[in-house]
């Protein structure tokens, strides 16, 4: 059974039970408040969707060299984001994947809601998982929906840019034009273990494994998102008494 079939079937079943409360539950966390990580970005912690879903094992710390954008390849009609993420947890921890938690560090919903995914991601970088193998050295940001032919909604793109900016600042990643980092792969179907890899600091899943993820429409927007992230990050380089930072011809505002 494919990811889309497994998760979609589970979501359809849950909708029959949740009925009219699905949309409200997707937007209103029951067990915790959103965590404000910047002046413009709040993230719903894992407890808002999975307080009763403990990870199946420990989460190892990660050495973050780049950020990786994914999509769930599920329906773009997502009345209950919380339930969708719970269904993804069920799939990722089932015999189909055997991962300890959801693979992704963060999720972004169509309405711009940002969710913590894998346990520990808000507190510090933790190792993620990915279909096709995990080359390592990344934090995974996953868009809820299928963006093979349809571009993500404006609210989703806005929150994604804010999240990528926050993570780039947090992990000291370069965001200037053509910024890259190198690492030795831990093993994926595109980059076997031991292979030296140079990756854009904001990349798409297909750059690391043989997959269509995050969909052609989303992948085609990566350069736009990188260009929007840079000035947000570059603004943080300016300090009182110092000249604005300049890197690769891109000047901090």
Model-identified regions with their sequence ranges:
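Active-site acidic/histidine clusters and adjacent loop/turn architecture
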Residues: 61-97
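Short secondary-structure junction motifs
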Residues: 101-103
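Short, conserved, surface-exposed binding loops centered on an aromatic residue
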Residues: 99, 130-134
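Basic/polar, cationic surfaces and motifs that engage anionic cell-wall
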Residues: 2, 10-11, 15-20, 27-61, ...
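A short, polar/proline- and glycine-enriched secondary-structure boundary/capping micro-motif
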Residues: 80, 126-129
